[in-house]
């Protein structure tokens, strides 16, 4: 080991090139100047815009459950499960992903309100689906709630329209 290191040192001093190979030989010889020229040519100038303080469009998340949601859900569960349905349809298990998808897709299309991805794992039975679709969703952002609330006299929120 010591002999190999000594040979390299002697080779460098004599200029024999026994040491490490130059970087250009290892990586194709590209220089940083060439890379900078290519990058400068590929950059497209973008216009800087002022941040917009316009009120964002309202999201269509509002959902009011229909009065007959239980009968709608019962009909869909019986339609999908067929004759294999147990006595109590609310206890119908949704462990089969195909069954769960069919039920939730039909309800989302019919009611216009889909189960978000973050809550799909919570839908284990028809009772869970009934609980989700029985819960109303209001369509107000926090800023809208602040505008509607009684604020102190030194605080006012106004959107540019």
From Swiss-Prot:
InterPro entries: Ribosomal_m50. Belongs to the mitochondrion-specific ribosomal protein mL50 family. Pfam families: Ribosomal_L50 (PF10501). It comes from the Eukaryota. Its main location: mitochondrion. PANTHER family: 39A RIBOSOMAL PROTEIN L50, MITOCHONDRIAL, LARGE RIBOSOMAL SUBUNIT PROTEIN ML50. Component of the mitochondrial ribosome large subunit (39S) which comprises a 16S rRNA and about 50 distinct proteins. Residues 27-51 are annotated as: Disordered. One of its GO terms (cellular component) is mitochondrial large ribosomal subunit. Keywords: Mitochondrion, Ribonucleoprotein, Ribosomal protein. It is found in: Mitochondrion. It comes from Gallus gallus. The keyword Mitochondrion applies. This is Large ribosomal subunit protein mL50. The keyword Metal-binding does not apply.
């Amino acid at each position: 080991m010591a002999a190999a290191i000594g040979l390299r040192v002697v080779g460098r001093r004599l200029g024999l090139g026994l040491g490490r190979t130059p970087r250009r030989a290892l990586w194709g010889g590209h220089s940083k100047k060439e890379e900078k020229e290519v990058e400068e040519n590929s950059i497209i100038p973008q216009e800087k815009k002022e941040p917009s303080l316009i009120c964002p469009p309202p999201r269509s998340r509002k959902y009011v459950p229909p009065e007959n949601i239980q009968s709608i859900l019962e009909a869909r569960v019986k339609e999908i499960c067929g004759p294999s349905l147990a006595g109590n349809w609310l206890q119908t298990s949704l462990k089969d992903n195909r069954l769960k998808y069919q039920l939730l897709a039909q309800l989302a299309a019919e009611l216009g309100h889909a189960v978000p991805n973050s809550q799909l794992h919570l839908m284990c039975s028809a009772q869970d689906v009934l609980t989700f679709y029985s819960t109303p969703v209001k369509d107000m952002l926090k800023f809208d709630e602040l505008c509607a609330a009684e604020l102190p006299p030194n605080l006012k929120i106004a959107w540019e329209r």
